């Protein structure tokens, strides 16, 4: 990786145009989900609660319009995708009817023509939180994410502990003090066929599952970038799924954001350049883990990356910077660029702005 960037390159990469990319979101927006269909952007959930909004990016007077509220309750870390004109929302973390925080494995469908939601009679074979979703040949594919039983059990224990700080400390120590493989993050690839509403096994990673990875796909290839290897410990790994031909192939590319990696980063493609930007992590956690400290991020402060990396000639190059570190927003393809909507910055503060990252001749332009 080229660790040296000239002042001119940074200046070009950090250029902010006078006009805003998109109007500010109606509420500070993080940990939600979003999708784009026919140049109309849809965002919702996360810090927006059950609210959903749309914005026509081609309209002369661009503005966010409120849609019908999501019927499944407030959720973080859900994913969404458009297939054949309908918006599908997968899983997420929220509260059940008893008020307990849990991982969901359900699917909701939104019809833009009628502005209405319906909960499908379809459940994924495992929970969906921290997972990624992408579309290929008319099907939605899901991989990664936390283990539903382990995650739900953790929050059940916290609920029973109430406000007993000593018990809460013990629960946290017990939860975080395990090796990565003991969290059983999902390494299976599942496919969802909207025509039948059936889930199918589509393969599995030869390595390990992650949570909070960035995902982007083009044609027959999909890339999963970084994410958590276990709670509090990120990975710098990059996985490529290649659907070319009849057999799905998994490839491991050169790492990025080394050595600690990030979660909640942003990925996209501009003029055939693969982009990875932002994300959050704990510097020093990888070294702690390698030295035998399973609770690797204990006592460490979460940091937010400003780095913009490009995949070029078989390696990652740091090619620019965001104006501020951010993570856990929405990544969407728009105008042959990577569109970032919302996210959080230092201290977990949710933001309302958008960022557009474009690449031409391996030079990055950032528009705020």
From Swiss-Prot:
GO cellular component, one term: periplasmic space
Compartments in which it is found: Periplasm
Active-site residue numbers: 228 (proton acceptor)
Function description: Converts alpha-N-acetylneuranimic acid (Neu5Ac) to the beta-anomer, accelerating the equilibrium between the alpha- and beta-anomers. Probably facilitates sialidase-negative bacteria to compete successfully for limited amounts of extracellular Neu5Ac, which is likely taken up in the beta-anomer. In addition, the rapid removal of sialic acid from solution might be advantageous to the bacterium to damp down host responses.
Protein name (record): N-acetylneuraminate epimerase
Transmembrane segments: none
Enzyme class, spelled out: isomerase
Residues in the signal sequence: 1-19
